[in-house]
Amino acid sequence: MNFKRILAGVMAGATSISLAACSNSGNGGFDSDTNSTASSSETTIDDEIDNPVSVGDISIDAGEDVEPAELEYLGNYDITTAGDVKPAYKYFSENYGCKIKCTIVGSLQILEKLTTAISAGESPDLVDYSDSTFPLMMSKNMYTPLDDYMDLSAPQWSGLDQYINKYKWNGKNYYYPWAYNVSSYFLIYNRGVFEQIGLEDPKELYDEGKWTWEAMADVIRKFIDSDTDGNRTGLYGASEYSAQAIIDSTGVPLIEIGEDGKLVSNFNNASVDRAATFMQSLKSEGLAKFQEGVINVDEDPIVSGTAAFQGMGEWIITNYAKKMKKDDSLDIFFVPFPRDSQADEYYYSMTTFGYLVPAGSKFAKQASVFINCCRLSNTDEDLKATTKESIMRNKKYTDEQYDFMYSFKEINNFHAVVDEPYGLDETTGQIIKDILGNTLFDLQNETYAGQSWTQMREANIGTINKQIEYYNGLITSGNS
């Protein structure tokens, strides 16, 4: 791809995108795995004593031999030491002669850093997938298509083409997710406190097929009513993502990707309206509420047993697992967001994760081999077993926590809903996040305080639809 064209596409949207990325989330706090601006300059130091990983006896086919190289990674974490990636990296390093140098930045800094690097002709070779990747950053020519380097017929990608192809941009594949999470956001609860109160265990309700919207609301009511002093609250957490999970449980995503690759809005869908009505009832009844001074990532309300549920990404479960290691009286567990009892199936809000190769990368072939290694850590039995050992040492999960959490990565066992509502552009994405968060929680947002779902939607549907039409127009006209 012509470098001047890459640069023009990147710079065309860089200013507005970067400024919008600094806007407040309005979600009652911040979500450290989605909105962080924290940064460190280089890779962290791995402690082989705490998490030694050996891949010497493993043999996988991640691609043909490549020239040894040092790849540059730009993203949220050290992919050479993280428990779930370290075995893949060690195999890549030892068998393909490649190293990866990590520059770790907050997620809100990735776009700015990537834009600057591409503009200077210093593109990194790997970058995290983020909310703004599709379609925003793809439309700006910020990535390298990987069709020439990846083989969808390879065993590790079996059964995934329907998901990978959803992220095509004008007929080209840029994104091959190596991680698939059917339930990437969970409802975390203090199982020990539930037992003390005499409440039914949500995990048991889930196992029995009884975990529905109504069951969750009933459990929260009983939890709150169990405290005569009125100090217990219901649901808190990642406000917009919790709301999205409830909507997706109807089987209808807010924004879906059609078979023709175009975006389809379902903001006016009757099932989405019904989910919004349910969320507003949770808010009005006080079942979804932040405690005074609490933000969405705070763990004390769950540990102390003063909140029923925290809706949060799986990343936070390791924090609770480590607390349980230090205090064996703690029993923290989690369940998926509940089923919509009016839906024909139990639908789960699916997310994906992986790396893309930025435009201008000099080592796209090597980067593709590494992506294959990461995917094989989920499919090759030997590498998968080594990866589990690494994760357990690194994240301190109990066997029960690990087994339940990782069961949701077998996506063909579930009815997965692919929903991409935040990637239109940073401004519109934030509008959608604000609408969702303020539907489920009383966030006292200056713009939306006191407004209903319908009022917020109608005030913004024109902006949302305009952006959808813009991207669909690019696909029609051939943005290449």
Predicted regions located by residue number:
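Conserved N-terminal structural module of periplasmic/extracytoplasmic solute-binding proteins
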Residues: 3, 7-9, 19-136, 140, ...
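Hinge/lid segment of periplasmic solute-binding proteins
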Residues: 45-67, 131-184, 214, 335
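Short helix-initiation/N-cap motifs at beta->coil->alpha
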Residues: 104-113, 132, 209-215, 291-303
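A structural signal for short loop-to-beta-strand junctions that line the ligand-binding cleft
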Residues: 116-117, 125, 129, 153-194, ...
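Short, solvent-exposed loop/beta-turn-alpha elements that line the ligand-binding surface or hinge
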Residues: 147-159, 205-208, 228, 254-274, ...
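Extracytoplasmic/periplasmic solute-binding protein
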Residues: 169-180, 185, 195, 212-264
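Glycine-centered hinge/linker elements that transmit conformational signals in sensory
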Residues: 220, 260-293
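Extracytoplasmic/periplasmic substrate-recognition and gating elements
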Residues: 324-392
